[in-house]
């Protein structure tokens, strides 16, 4: 794709994100390549209202010091770190802003899916029930996933 095609592509899809709330994105301090990746996506999609939240690395950090009560047996340290990072972003949003809502992303999100939307952010937001508290948006991989069970068949 040459520069002109890239510009036309960008201008055709970036408008779909008009009205996007402030974006908080989770990123481990050591993952500078993911930080660069996210910052380049924000530039490409013309998203200026974003804040990086330094994440907890459950593989290296002892997150149990931040928790009360018993940690479930089937939760890994990495999952706890991810959960703690999300809670840190929510806390920052709650304590540091007067905004009504925000968006929280992990640093491996791929915003290219927006080009395939047949709606805008404002269209989507207008369809959320009036009494919502939290909305989870996710993209499910449509490819065949190989798990240990699938490999055994």
Language-model segments: residues:
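A short, hydrophobic C-terminal helix/tail in secreted or cell-surface proteins
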Residues: 149-153
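An acidic/histidine-cluster motif and surrounding catalytic segment
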Residues: 1-105, 109-148
């Amino acid at each position: 794709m040459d520069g002109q095609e890239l510009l036309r592509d960008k201008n055709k899809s970036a408008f779909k994100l008009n009205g996007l709330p402030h974006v908080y994105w989770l990123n481990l301090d050591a993952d500078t390549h993911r930080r660069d990746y996210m910052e380049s996506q924000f530039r490409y999609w013309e998203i200026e209202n974003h804040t990086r939240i330094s994440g907890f690395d459950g593989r290296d950090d002892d997150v149990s010091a931040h928790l009360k009560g018993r940690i479930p047996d089937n939760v890994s340290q990495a999952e706890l770190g991810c959960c703690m990072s999300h809670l840190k972003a929510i806390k920052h949003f709650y304590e540091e802003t007067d905004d009504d809502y925000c968006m929280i992303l992990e640093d491996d999100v791929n915003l290219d899916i927006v080009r395939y939307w047949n709606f805008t952010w404002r269209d989507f937001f207008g369809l959320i029930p009036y009494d919502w508290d939290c909305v989870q948006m996710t993209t499910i991989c449509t490819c065949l996933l190989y798990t240990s069970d699938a490999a055994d068949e």
